[in-house]
């Protein structure tokens, strides 16, 4: 059986300037604060709460290992914790622009994630019973991620 993907929702969040901790043995540690945002899709709509971040490592080969954690709040007040692991890579020229916060064409960047969702709301339990993937786009002050459920 060939797996299929079902679109679930699109998330748009604003991010602050990265905190660059500098080189560590695994690469360059950067912490990108999440300032807030919105999400909307099939039966889900709400906001991205401020206070999350992406604790990323940029390896020597330019690949970014992403470890993003944040909280969503639905329009009816339900909370969803998100832990989103992923990778992002591009050519050295495009990666250099990304690191400087310059705009790049999203089609030149491979940006994929595998999120895990947690919620105590019974009507959102399905989020914890499926596998999801995300496709991302990075802009100077924003990130857009589209989440898909693996059927």
Identify the function of each model-found stretch:
Residues 1-151:
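Beta-strand-enriched cores of mature, soluble protein domains
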